[in-house]
């Protein structure tokens, strides 16, 4: 088992969201130019206000990819009836570039976990060609990554990474006596 896959299995990303796959492309997700997403690490929602920079490896500029960011734990991990909640989708990303070169078909929505610890998953799929994804999903709630990728003829995932986030508590004021 590869070291890229093991944390995805332990974190139940493979199983709950994605099927087993063999990573074949490098993907680096960075928030605020210095916070790199690592599997299973926790990030504060205040760091996630702006969409991340997502750098894609690959062999050449003639390969195109679709990036999907989703929350499989919405609205809460104990009752994820909105599984999966779609936070962002970018298609037609050329290999060896980053997501800013693609076509954003679902705008980035800041993660706002209310209850419990949520997993936020970035999954990258190789397209058969440019403009493989013809339409945006009708809703963000109850999105199904596997069904979507199958419908548009996308590959199995070629890369994935996830982080955890939970609601930030407000600073408590000390009582004045």
UniProtKB/Swiss-Prot annotation:
Q: What InterPro entries does this protein map onto?
A: PEBP, PEBP-like_sf, PEBP_euk, Phosphatidylethanolamine-bd_CS
Alphabetical GO biological process terms: flower development; vegetative to reproductive phase transition of meristem
Q: Does the keyword Oxidoreductase apply?
A: no
| Residue pairs linked by disulfide bridges in the UniProt entry | none
Q: Does the keyword Cytoplasm feature in the UniProt annotation?
A: yes
GO CC, sorted alphabetically, is: cytoplasm
Q: Check the record and name the Pfam families matching this protein.
A: PBP
Q: Where is the signal peptide?
A: none
- Xref: PROSITE patterns: PBP
Instruction: Classify the main location.
Output: cytoplasm
Q: Which UniProt keywords apply?
A: Cytoplasm
Question: Tell me, what does this protein do in biology?
Answer: May form complexes with phosphorylated ligands by interfering with kinases and their effectors.
Recorded protein name is: Protein BROTHER of FT and TFL 1
Source species? Arabidopsis thaliana (Mouse-ear cress)
Higher taxonomy: Eukaryota, Viridiplantae, Streptophyta, Embryophyta, Tracheophyta
């Amino acid at each position: 088992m590869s070291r890229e896959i093991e944390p995805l299995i332990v974190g139940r990303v493979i199983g709950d969201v994605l099927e087993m796959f063999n990573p074949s492309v490098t993907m680096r997700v960075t928030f605020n130019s210095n916070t790199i997403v690592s599997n299973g690490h926790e990030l504060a929602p205040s760091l996630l206000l702006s969409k991340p920079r997502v750098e894609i490896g690959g062999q050449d500029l003639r390969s195109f990819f679709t990036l999907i960011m989703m929350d499989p734990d919405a609205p809460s991990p104990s009752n994820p009836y909105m599984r999966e909640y779609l936070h962002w989708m970018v298609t037609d990303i050329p290999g060896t570039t980053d997501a800013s070169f693609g076509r954003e078909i679902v705008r980035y929505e800041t993660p706002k976990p209310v209850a419990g610890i949520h997993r936020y998953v970035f999954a990258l799929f190789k397209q058969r060609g440019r403009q493989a994804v013809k339409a945006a999903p009708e809703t963000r709630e109850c999105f199904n990554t596997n069904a979507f990728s199958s419908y548009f003829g996308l590959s199995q995932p070629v890369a994935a990474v996830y982080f955890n986030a939970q609601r930030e508590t407000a600073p408590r004021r000390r009582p004045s006596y």
